[in-house]
Amino acid sequence: QDFNRQRAFCLKQGLLFEDATFPAHVKSIGPNLLPEDQLRQIQWKRPIELQKNPYLIMDGVSRFDIIQGYQLGDCWLLAALGSLTLQKQFLAKVLPKDQGFQDDYAGIFHFRFWQYGDWVDVVIDDRLPFLNGRYLSVHPRTSNEFWPSLLEKAYAKLRGSYQNLHGGYLSDALVDLTGGVQVQLSLKDPPPDLEEILTAADKSQCLMGCSTTGQWRKNIELKNGIVQGHAYTVTGTVKIRYKNGWQHIIRLWNPWGHGEWNGPWSDNSPQWDHVEPKCREALLRNKDDGEFWMSCENFQEQFSWLYICNDTP
């Protein structure tokens, strides 16, 4: 499908694009994602039906734009996406700027993913699935910003259905969004220079994510706030003055858009009382937005795998 040709045709005819290759139909959802009675209740709506002034992007692209949907277990994709938003050089390849709801809107969008050694352009219409008035999949934190929902739909089309996003590998998503090379490190048997590896990867603008063990379908949240069988984005790492020495801390983000670690170095932990106020102000966002800090030791205890991806080895 040629995006420019299809859009020009729709604009000329005064039509909104309807994608016959990934239709607003139950087969695009997949047969086993939901019970049959719920599948029958799915409605498809365009952003222009949901909002008076929809935007593809508002005030730039950020991980905080993303909130994982309540029916789709695609944290592995969204954790990779959260990392992608931090690296604008990769983002520009995936999310072309020649589209939106303001100029030349025809209900058609396109996104690019890396597949088998090449960038593939995936064209979609903008009809999104709803169940009982709620987004079936990812939904925007700002009600009229739609890039997360539309990008996820394009990736679902690439994979054959939304159901095929239900459980997957963070390592695959990182490569599909960058065309890069990824490395997996076991945190149960970590390299002795893990802190240096994290610092170097952060400095080199690598994409980073991590995962916990456990059954991902169950979404079990431990008392300490960490979710089992779940993927997170590593969004930063820093060494700070703490008491009389130095402390290496790591910042992580949960694709749920809420639900955070509540141990040492979490938003309200007493450790921050021993950090210079200027440094604390620069690093700490005391909000339930899914992002939190933790020590390198706790990171190794709580997570099982670290994934690092860059466009060069």
Model-based region annotation:
Residues 1-313:
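Structured alpha-helical subdomains that flank or immediately precede key functional sites
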